[in-house]
């Protein structure tokens, strides 16, 4: 079977970050007395479901450690590897850091798919690592029933510049760096619903590196940052609000969307992860139409950065985004928490 004829998505039951275990189930898995081990140098651990772990070395520098892997979200092996690696490296940028090294995680059904196809996947990962300026320094592989690829990535960050998802403040404006709808478009493609003019759009967005994160972290008025991935905008924004004790107002019409996404939602191109996300976070939302909910809960793979920015830093953030060619979009604001109001209010 050639690399050009292969359809990797046929070999997996899930796709991309839509493979994630639901937040509710994950809470059960991680709940343990042993998880309460306290190391004063561990600045970021499990407590706030942040993008990566951060460890203070005590010399003004902290180490960032993260891992991310999933099953194919696209059919092309090289693109699958590139997307998976870009997605994993993004966690370092979302914490405000600089990646320094990565190792690969590969699960491969060796009785179904050739090693040459696995090599193409790995080459895609290596390409993304080169884009980020790091080496793919090694890894680990197993014989698995479904193809899996990802990275474990190490980064560094000045300790004072660590950006958490839990340090937002009321008064911050919310900005997104990529459009939503990746899960919808990739599902539409799997269902053979995707129009010719929309082919490749999701892949292009997923391959965009969130490299601007380190520069955003240098701006004092950027109070919190996270990347929008498997739990959707609603999930990651809810975690930001819960960690900071604030609430959010979001302008639905302002949210950047991939072309055709609302049409595909009406046609039923909604990934399974959407329902899992709503089951975990839906109680935090106000009333809204089903199609709005399906977009806000859409699992993103290698999605954009979500920034909480104080108004006085808005111009500097926009200028930084322009330097990286990012179409930055304001989607709402954070407000003081008040009883009787939804944590995430959609207008």
From Swiss-Prot:
UniProt: ATP binding residues: 20, 48-50, 68, 91, 139-141
Reactions catalysed: hydrogenselenide + ATP + H2O = selenophosphate + AMP + phosphate + 2 H(+)
GO process terms (BP): selenocysteine biosynthetic process
Sequence intervals crossing the membrane: none
Keywords for the protein's UniProt record, in alphabetical order: ATP-binding, Kinase, Magnesium, Metal-binding, Nucleotide-binding, Selenium, Transferase
Database matches in InterPro entries: PurM-like_C_dom, PurM-like_C_sf, PurM-like_N, PurM-like_N_sf, SelD_I, SPS/SelD
A Pfam entry, by short name: AIRS
GO molecular function ontology, one term from the record: selenide, water dikinase activity
Binding-site list for Mg(2+): 51, 91, 227
Xref: Gene3D superfamilies: PurM-like C-terminal domain, PurM-like, N-terminal domain
Disulphide linkage map: none
Active site, renumbered: 17
Enzyme Commission (EC) number: 2.7.9.3
Gene Ontology CC annotations of this record: cytoplasm
Enzyme type, top EC level: transferase
Residues at the site labelled Important for catalytic activity: 20
Cofactor(s) needed: Mg(2+)
Function of the molecule: Synthesizes selenophosphate from selenide and ATP.
Subunit note: Homodimer.
Entry protein name: Selenide, water dikinase
Organism: Escherichia coli O6:H1 (strain CFT073 / ATCC 700928 / UPEC)
Lineage of source species: Bacteria, Pseudomonadati, Pseudomonadota, Gammaproteobacteria, Enterobacterales
Gene that produces this protein: selD
């Amino acid at each position: 079977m050639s690399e050009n004829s292969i359809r990797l998505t046929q070999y997996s039951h899930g796709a991309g970050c839509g493979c994630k275990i639901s937040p509710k189930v994950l809470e059960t898995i991680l709940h343990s007395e042993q998880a309460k081990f306290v190391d004063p140098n561990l600045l970021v651990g499990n407590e706030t479901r942040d993008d990566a772990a951060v460890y203070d070395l005590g010399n003004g520098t902290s180490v960032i450690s993260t891992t991310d892997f999933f099953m194919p979200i696209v059919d092309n092996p090289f693109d699958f590897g590139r997307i998976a690696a870009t997605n994993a490296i993004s966690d370092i940028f979302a914490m405000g850091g600089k990646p320094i090294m990565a190792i690969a995680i590969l699960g491969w059904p060796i009785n179904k798919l050739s090693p040459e196809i696995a090599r193409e996947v790995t080459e895609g990962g290596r390409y993304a690592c080169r884009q980020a300026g790091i080496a793919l320094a090694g890894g680990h592989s197993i014989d698995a029933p479904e193809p899996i690829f990802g990275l474990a990535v190490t980064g560094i960050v000045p300790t004072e510049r660590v950006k958490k998802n839990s340090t937002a403040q009321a008064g911050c404006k919310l900005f997104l760096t990529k459009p939503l709808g990746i899960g919808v478009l990739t599902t539409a493609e799997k269902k053979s619903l995707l129009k010719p003019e929309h082919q490749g759009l999701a892949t292009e967005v997923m391959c965009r590196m969130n490299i601007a994160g380190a520069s955003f972290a240098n701006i004092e008025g950027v109070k919190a940052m996270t990347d929008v991935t498997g739990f959707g905008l609603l999930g990651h924004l809810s975690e930001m609000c819960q960690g900071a004790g604030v609430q959010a107002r979001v302008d639905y019409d302002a949210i950047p969307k991939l072309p055709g996404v609302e049409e595909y939602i009406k046609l039923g191109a909604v990934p399974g992860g959407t329902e899992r996300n709503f089951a975990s976070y839906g109680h935090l939302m106000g009333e809204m139409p089903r199609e709005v909910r399906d977009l806000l809960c859409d699992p993103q793979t290698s999605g954009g950065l979500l920034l909480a920015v104080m108004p006085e830093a808005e111009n500097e953030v926009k200028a930084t985004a322009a330097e990286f060619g990012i179409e930055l979009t304001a989607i709402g604001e954070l407000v003081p928490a008040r009883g009787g109001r939804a944590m995430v209010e959609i207008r």
